[in-house]
């Protein structure tokens, strides 16, 4: 029972940290290397 409580308390924390770091990484990649969808807006 203690293992289940430990799993339920750590899985959301680890998932939040993982998705937060993944989102930050994707934001920084798109900031440094913007995709082609943003080119028409800045070319005018």
Swiss-Prot record:
Subcellular location: Plastid, Chloroplast thylakoid membrane
HAMAP family: PSI_PsaJ
Family annotation (InterPro entries): PSI_PsaJ, PSI_PsaJ_sf
Main location: plastid
One GO location term (cellular component): photosystem I
Family, similarity comment: Belongs to the PsaJ family.
Protein name as it appears in the record: Photosystem I reaction center subunit IX
């Amino acid at each position: 029972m203690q293992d289940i409580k430990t799993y339920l308390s750590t899985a959301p924390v680890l998932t939040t940290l993982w998705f937060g770091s993944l989102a930050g990484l994707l934001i920084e990649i798109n900031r440094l290397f913007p995709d082609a969808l943003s080119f028409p807006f800045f070319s005018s």
